[in-house]
From Swiss-Prot:
Keywords of the record: Ribonucleoprotein, Ribosomal protein, RNA-binding, rRNA-binding
GO biological process terms on file: ribosomal large subunit assembly; translation
Record bears the keyword rRNA-binding: yes
Source superkingdom: Bacteria
Presence of keyword Ribonucleoprotein: yes
GO molecular function terms attached to this record: rRNA binding; structural constituent of ribosome
One Pfam family per UniProt: Ribosomal_L20
GO CC, alphabetical: ribonucleoprotein complex; ribosome
Primary role: Binds directly to 23S ribosomal RNA and is necessary for the in vitro assembly process of the 50S ribosomal subunit. It is not involved in the protein synthesizing functions of that subunit.
Family: Belongs to the bacterial ribosomal protein bL20 family.
Source species: Pelobacter propionicus (strain DSM 2379 / NBRC 103807 / OttBd1)
Listed name of the protein: Large ribosomal subunit protein bL20
Cross-referenced InterPro entries: Ribosomal_bL20, RIBOSOMAL_L20_CS, Ribosomal_protein_bL20_C
Length: 117
């Protein structure tokens, strides 16, 4: 069989990594080995942090709901308990948005929660 030098395939694979490493500092954007390590690390962090972002936003929503419910005389846990008892099915994302953008509407929801406790 004829000898295959793999020039095209290897260059394409290296260019793919170097394209992902574009904008990195120093050798990390120029040298294939350094770029490979940097890209691998960056992709691992991106994968991990897409999951961490969900946790962070949920805790932010809970903090905002807690602050708004305390302004209405309820703790967060009592507020959520009251909503569950009243069969109010508004998720934390929407509750946090209402707490920030419409405090009067949130106080009405808090009244519903307080009445059902």
């Amino acid at each position: 069989m004829a000898r295959v030098k793999r020039g095209f395939k290897a260059r394409r694979r290296r260019n793919k990594v170097l394209k992902l490493a574009k904008g990195y500092r120093g050798a990390r954007s120029k040298l294939f080995r350094s770029a490979t390590e940097a890209v691998d690390r960056a992709l691992n962090y991106a994968f991990r942090d897409r999951r961490v972002k969900k946790r962070d936003f949920r805790s932010l929503w809970i903090t905002r709901i807690n602050a708004a419910s305390r302004l209405n005389g309820l703790s967060y846990s009592k507020f959520i308990f009251g909503l569950k008892k009243a069969n109010v099915e508004i998720d934390r994302k929407v509750l946090a948005d209402i707490a920030v953008s419409d405090p009067k509407g949130f106080s009405e929801i808090a009244g519903v929660a307080r009445a059902s406790i």
